[in-house]
Amino acid sequence: MRAFLEEFKNFISRGNALDLAVGVVIGGAFGKIVTSFVADLFTPVLGLMIGGVNFQHLAWEIGGSPEDPVTINYGSFLQAVFDFVIIAFAIFLLVKAINTLQRKEEESPPTLPPPEVVLLTEIRDILNRHSQ
């Protein structure tokens, strides 16, 4: 059991597992923010723009009694689709920004050696020419 716990500790302390855990926590929080944005800001404004529609209450009655109808709540589904599109777009922008930064790092010109190294290289070359 001790070896198992030690192996688990080593797994958790590796960078990838920690990065994944942080990503999941931040992703969950970001998802809640986007859900609130869609439900509380985006769909009400969109509903007003297309004629005062409340997306949360859009549903088809497919059966049941008038007091307790069976419904397909497609308005909730539309909100989930809006959530997904906004989250996917935000992730796209984030990945695009990260790729741009990585490309700039790769394309940066090589740094010049310090003046001391240049001087020592010149001295070495002079000594090599004189020794021949």
Curated annotation (Swiss-Prot):
One of its GO terms (molecular function) is mechanosensitive monoatomic ion channel activity. The chain crosses the membrane at residues 11-31, 75-95. GO terms for cellular component: plasma membrane. Signal peptide: none annotated. Keywords: Cell inner membrane, Cell membrane, Ion channel, Ion transport, Membrane, Transmembrane, Transmembrane helix, Transport. Gene3D superfamilies: Large-conductance mechanosensitive channel, MscL, domain 1 (1.10.1200.120). It comes from the Bacteria. It is a multi-pass membrane protein. It holds the Pfam family MscL. The keyword Cell inner membrane applies. It is found in: Cell inner membrane. InterPro entries: MS_channel, MSC/AndL, MscL_channel. Coiled coil: none annotated. NCBIfam families: mscL, PRK00567.1-4. PANTHER family: LARGE-CONDUCTANCE MECHANOSENSITIVE CHANNEL, MECHANOSENSITIVE CHANNEL MSCL. Homopentamer. Channel that opens in response to stretch forces in the membrane lipid bilayer. May participate in the regulation of osmotic pressure changes within the cell. Belongs to the MscL family. This is Large-conductance mechanosensitive channel. It comes from Synechococcus sp. (strain JA-2-3B'a(2-13)) (Cyanobacteria bacterium Yellowstone B-Prime). The lineage of its organism: Bacteria, Bacillati, Cyanobacteriota, Cyanophyceae, Synechococcales.
